[in-house]
Amino acid sequence: NGERSRADDYRAQGSLLMEYEILKGLSISVSGMLDFTQGNLNQFRPSTLDPQFNENYSKGGMLRKISLLTEELLRYNTSIREKHNIELLLGLSVSKDQEFSMQGSGRRSGSDYVYYYPVQVEGGIHNYGTATSPRYRPLTTYESNFKEKTMVSYFGRIGYNYKRRYLVEFTYRQDGSSTFGENHRWAKFPSIALGWAFSEESFIKKWTERWLSWGKVRASYGTSGQIFDDAYLAHGIVKMEGGSFNGVTLAEPGENIAPELTWEKTKQYDIGLDMDMFDNRVGLKFDYYYKYTDGLLYSVSLPGDIYYNSTQMQNALEVSNEGIEFDVQADIFRESAVKWRTKFNVSRNWNRFEKSANGRDIGNLIQGRPVNAFNVYVDDGYFQNEDEVPRYYNMQGDEKYLSNDRLITISAKTGYSNLVGTPKIMDLNGDGVINNKDRMFYGTSLPMAHGGWANEISWKNFDLNVLFNITLSRQMRNNNAWTLTQGNPVFVDLRGVSFWSKEGDNTTYGRIGTYAESLRSQIEKVNSVSLKQITLGYNLPKQFVKKIRLSEARVFVTGENIFYWSNYSGGNPEVISVYTGVDDGGQYPLPQKWTIGLTLNF
């Protein structure tokens, strides 16, 4: 059809490291890193694809990003009598990120065969109306944007262990970022970690030496910070999008200035256990963590009319996360010709919305409930006739039907509620109105457990790697299926699907033309297993590799997203966001991908 689009991406990375040993155990290092990326885009649409104005259209854009990082480290390591091991570290880090973008467009070029807009048409605007009723539109547009942010960090670490049996480490860092207001740029983040290699204790060895190779318990506490992506959110943003006056473009505030914005801070506690057993054939790892994050950004409504915008970004929310992680690794066959190592991990996370700035719930964020919660209406089939539709009486004694988020309802005297064939939603508080007060908590989109199973098998020059993903008891809402009752559904397999049409029907969905969302009946408890990746490789014989002056050569074939099994009524649940758990039919399915490769080492 003549439409063209071209994208070119470029990237260059470079790093430099210099290290010098001043004294035995004392060294200094200086490093630098540069990361440059640029993307160019050009799009062209010929005049034949513009039925209204018969104009061709060309658009071009460029996005350039530059990241610079320099880091200076002073290290000191020493051991006293091979018992007391000490490690000291002091560091300074400076980073700068720049982003520059520009784009422009042009219309009414001289030819549909020139894909780039050559020169600006004289005048720059065109009247698409008449002399008496003009309607002007620019023939060319241009916009550009520049962002820059800088961060400076000072940090230090002190580590000590006795015979590598008792371990303690203290870390402290102070970070400053240009993204915050002048009085809130700096933040302090201390942390401490403790460890005990209990397997080295003589009183434990005599009970465990036959099966325990190594074991350690560990605990830590630390704080960390997060900056927001927008470089100027705290300083206020001015947009050149306010229209024009007398031919001059106007500027307007994009966001209210927020000089009190500061770091999102997280306090985290960890307890862990590491064990290797049976001559290091089996390894176990267990972790428990608790994280509390405050100062999360949220757009807060402002009182009165004195502000240009009615909202302001503030550090307004607090959220907690708690979880466990378990890993096991085992060498099933280690000394035989066939070697097989298997790894299994499983994790569980709980989160909770702890607090808002004003102490109130925010939409689906209910204090004390999970962040990823489903707050739904309770439904029980469909209204089969008018007698099933609840009736209420107002203050004047008039009989009314059940209302949908309205106090003014259809009079019951007409005998027609327009609710027959629609979901029978429970009025939980009995006020005659279906609204958010009738919602109930019905689980979370976070799975009860999520894990993976990896296998590494080798025989002679062949190797096989297989990875499975497993998800258990994940709540999901199949919103996509309910679009079938609307006039513009996302088309799915209609076999076995039925719609309510008359009294007594026991159908999959209500009558055509109705739609209800956030219903309990839409929630499904989903389990799934997927073969995510399988790789078969072959290492060429060493004699042959040496003849062609290589140190190693390997050919392999890899498959991704091979298959999945799930009890979900929709498509592959892996593409549904774990944060929302809502399937709206807009997710692109995971492609099955096969790769053939060759690895050469010189």
Residue ranges and their predicted role:
Residues 1, 43-58, 100-141, 234-257, ...:
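Surface-exposed loop/turn segments flanking beta-strands in extracellular/periplasmic regions
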Residues 102-114, 331-443, 567:
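Conserved small-residue
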Residues 177, 417-418, 471-560:
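Extracytoplasmic gating/loop element in the C-terminal half of outer-membrane beta-barrel translocons
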Residues 6, 11, 52-165, 221, ...:
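Outer-membrane beta-barrel transmembrane domain signature of Gram-negative proteins
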Residues 3, 12, 132-153, 243-283, ...:
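Outer-membrane beta-barrel signature, preferentially recognizing the C-terminal barrel domain
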Residues 8-11, 17-110, 178-185, 290-323, ...:
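Small-side-chain secondary-structure face that scaffolds active or pore-lining regions
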Residues 316-321, 364-388, 493-495, 504-505, ...:
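C-terminal beta-signal and terminal closure region of outer-membrane beta-barrel proteins
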Residues 23-25, 79-86, 165, 199-215, ...:
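Short loop/turn motifs that connect adjacent beta-strands in outer-membrane beta-barrel proteins
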